[in-house]
Amino acid sequence: MRSIYCGQVNEAHAGQTITLCGWVHRRRDLGGLIFIDMRDREGIVQVFFDPDKPDAFALASELRGEFCIQVSGVVRTRPDSQRNSDMATGAIEVFAHELTIINRAEPLPLDFNQVNSEEQRLKFRYLDLRRPEMAKYLKTRAKASAFVRRFMDEHGFLDIETPMLTKATPEGARDYLVPSRVHKGKFYALPQSPQLFKQLLMMSGFDRYYQIVKCFRDEDLRADRQPEFTQIDVETSFMTAPQVRELMEEMIRNLWQHVLAVDLGDFPVMTFDEAMRRFGSDKPDLRLPMELVDVADLLTAVEFAVFAGPANDPKGRVAALKVPGGAELSRKQIDEYTKFVGIYGAKGLAWMKVNEAANGIEGVQSPVAKFLSDEIVREILARTGAADGDIIFFGADSKKVVADAIGALRLKVGRDLGLMENSWKPLWVIDFPMFEEDSEGGLAAMHHPFTAPSNLGPSELKANPLSAYANAYDMVINGYEVGGGSVRIHNSEMQATVFDILGITPAEQRLKFGFLLDALKYGTPPHAGLAFGLDRLSMLLTGTDNIRDVIAFPKTTAAACLMTDAPSFANQAQMSELAIATTVKGDE
């Protein structure tokens, strides 16, 4: 029906007769001529109708926004005075000879010329996706996916599918459960990741595996999370962690070059401990030239319990954050930041404005200065590198609260004051703790329970699990964790030890993971891998800050689809066939 896309017509086609299919983006009548901007997924082109072609002209007078049409006509170059540099096709226009109205459109519930509510956009997603901006997002995602498939194929990886209906495993979030009709009372789980299946593929001899796969997690949502999401899932045998990182870094560097023509350069490597100490986050945004600086050793003897308490507590921390130019902040703004850090558990926010750094305590303005000596103030200024016109914020609490609160404050103040560099800052974060304490006083795996420790045997790990580091690695770009992985446990004794530490009884181990423990007994190769979030990568590549923009039919933050009204109640016949009942009625 078409010979070319609207957005692909250019001066090289001048004089040619072409056929276009698409939608009326805009219509206007000018001096006896009718002009339309005609749109398809590749872009927009101007088409005009002249009374010299009376049939097409008469029909064009009926055109309205979003009519689906077919146009045949001749490509003409525009006079210099009429060229539109804002359009990729702005040097040409199409003189229409024939027009077919394929389908008319009722008045739209969305207005493409203004900002529509998120609710309306999701309810009428099939219309929202017609917008050129949305088409650009999904085309970029498709381009990224195609590149990844080529790269993986060229490097010897096999695209192997793993099951969607599987068994529930503890991976940190709730599972989506699917009732079995055949096995009444039993449930499948939709996979949170293909983790165990890809490890089993390594045991099966498929030493380089990948797939671009849907995963499901029933967890609280936010701007960069969805209940169903897409992973670029990778696993390898006989490769070390540095080798895996090197290969995957090459893929991401080449992806950025392919899609954005940007050279990311070599990725720096930072330990988890360093990232938390300097930035208060295990996914630091390095575009912001501000760091947390330890000052506890200066404050152990001050007569100010807010500082002295954490400074003398092995589990406490006092950190300073210098904000360039921050002395201009008003008291009202500082009070707002004090409320902000309270969200993260901080009980307050001490501050120090630097008016004349050379004058030490006489050159600063701070409600806590009266508790400090001139020597201490000068050392704080020296350590933070503070200059005239800066402000220093202090976090004094447990290490976790200081990291969470001042780490978040760093990002918020940096954005508010426009201190964020317009650049790409990727890095690897490595050497994560193997375990962390959970809310009930037990231990939880920081990544997942199949991650191998770094250079520890089972007995050493069991003796002191909280001091163990995992052979794990995350890739971070501009403050987003875009991928994470690890070297996996490849012997049954170590795997059973990790399960023991996590409080999984031998009986539970057999029930939930018996197949894995058995498989580990039959010549398992060393293996490692990782998974990238394709949605998150696409979000970065397109420049949007909302992951829903790069997913064709996303869910809301309440995990609902406004367009199809999912989830919905099942009828009683379906429930009976599945031998299940619910305590919630359909009208509640």
From Swiss-Prot:
Residues 195-198 are annotated as: Aspartate. It catalyses: tRNA(Asp) + L-aspartate + ATP = L-aspartyl-tRNA(Asp) + AMP + diphosphate. One of its GO terms (biological process) is aspartyl-tRNA aminoacylation. It comes from the Bacteria. InterPro entries: Aa-tRNA-synt_II (IPR004364), aa-tRNA-synth_II (IPR006195), aa-tRNA-synth_II/BPL/LPL (IPR045864), Asp-tRNA-ligase_1 (IPR004524), Asp-tRNA-ligase_1_N (IPR047089), Asp/Asn-tRNA-synth_IIb (IPR002312), AspRS_core (IPR047090), GAD-like_sf (IPR004115). ATP binds at residues 217-219, 226, 481, 533-536. Its main location: cytoplasm. L-aspartate binds at residues 171, 217, 447, 488. GO terms for molecular function: aspartate-tRNA ligase activity; ATP binding; nucleic acid binding. Homodimer. Catalyzes the attachment of L-aspartate to tRNA(Asp) in a two-step reaction: L-aspartate is first activated by ATP to form Asp-AMP and then transferred to the acceptor end of tRNA(Asp). PANTHER family: ASPARTATE--TRNA LIGASE, MITOCHONDRIAL (PTHR22594:SF5), ASPARTYL/LYSYL-TRNA SYNTHETASE (PTHR22594). This is Aspartate--tRNA ligase. The lineage of its organism: Bacteria, Pseudomonadati, Pseudomonadota, Gammaproteobacteria, Aeromonadales.
